[in-house]
């Protein structure tokens, strides 16, 4: 099997952008929207999917505006979940995952990403003892704000056509009027329940990273921050290329996408509590309770 590398981080931590940047170098075999949407469909083609996207008026992801195309790098969690498995890898889903690796095997290193596996990386390390891991981090307040924004966007009045193509579960939930009503109500920010739910997940995943990242040998892991990637994309990508022994990086095409906006009120009210709960993570990654990041850190 070709060398295997996982990009891991919280949802909305910058995994998509990092995956795009690395995919555009042409040095990796990556999973794409075409693979996910047409998985198991004989005779499918990127051109046919491109026409379908055009006919349905799907040009960008609702949550963040990322342009959609058959070649957009995507997460393997959808294939797992569409076949009845959890969104993260388990012993039961390894055979299906092996099929994904077989499809992607073209001689280049295989690069995959799945935020769901950020809190389950010890299993990946055990299941794939030669795999390497690229962890990307972002200030938790920004992660939570962005994740809540995406949740609210995909459960707004209009179905997210792109997510519906990717996820059978989303289609099923949307088709149930009662379920759709509940999620839409949560997406209004009622009682701040969506913020609390997302905050709990982010806190738990980051604490897991603090407690377990050192169990991975240093030769198998590298971490970077979204903030540093925005400030110096070429420098941070070169760190990854050096880590993977791939030489100099090609020229970049995807521009930086730093996003700044005032925190939503329901999140602002929780920042002190969150920074206290994640004090170890803040210290490890150089994040401050005021929502800023200390100067560049490399680990």
Task: Please name every model-derived segment.
Residues 7:
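Hydrophobic anchor at the beta1->P-loop junction of P-loop NTPases
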Residues 10:
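P-loop (Walker A) phosphate-binding loop of NTP-binding proteins
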Residues 17, 120-127:
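A short acidic, amphipathic alpha-helical/loop segment
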Residues 34-111, 177-183:
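PAPS-dependent sulfation machinery
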Residues 113-115, 124-149:
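Conserved phosphate-donor/acceptor-positioning beta-strand/loop module used by diverse small-molecule
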């Amino acid at each position: 099997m070709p060398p295997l590398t996982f990009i891991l981080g919280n949802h909305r931590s910058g995994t998509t952008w990092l995956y795009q940047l690395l995919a555009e170098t042409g040095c990796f075999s990556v999973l794409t929207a075409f693979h996910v949407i047409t998985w198991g469909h004989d005779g499918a083609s990127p051109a046919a999917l491109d026409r379908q996207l055009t006919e349905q008026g799907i040009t960008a992801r609702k949550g963040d505006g990322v342009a959609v195309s058959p070649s957009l790098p995507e997460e393997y969690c959808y294939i797992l979940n569409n076949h009845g498995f959890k969104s993260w890898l388990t012993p039961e889903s390894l055979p299906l995952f092996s099929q994904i690796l077989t499809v992607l095997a073209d001689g280049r290193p295989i690069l995959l990403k799945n935020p769901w596996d950020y809190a389950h990386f010890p299993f990946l390390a055990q299941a794939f003892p030669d795999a390497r891991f690229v962890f990307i981090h972002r200030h938790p307040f920004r992660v939570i704000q962005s994740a809540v924004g995406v949740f609210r966007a995909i459960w707004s009045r209009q179905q997210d056509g792109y997510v519906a193509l990717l996820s059978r579960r989303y289609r099923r939930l949307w088709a149930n009027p009662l379920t759709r009503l509940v999620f839409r109500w949560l997406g209004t920010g009622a009682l701040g329940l969506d913020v609390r739910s997302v905050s709990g997940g982010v806190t738990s995943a980051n604490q897991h990273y603090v407690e377990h990242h050192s169990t991975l040998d240093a030769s198998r892991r590298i971490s970077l921050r979204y903030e540093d990637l925005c400030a110096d994309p070429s420098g941070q990508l070169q760190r990854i290329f050096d880590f993977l022994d791939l030489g100099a990086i090609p020229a970049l095409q995807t521009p930086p996408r730093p996003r700044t906006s005032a925190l939503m009120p329901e999140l602002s009210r929780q920042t002190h509590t969150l920074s206290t709960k994640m004090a170890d993570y803040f210290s490890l990654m150089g994040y401050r309770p005021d929502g800023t990041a200390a100067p560049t850190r490399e680990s």
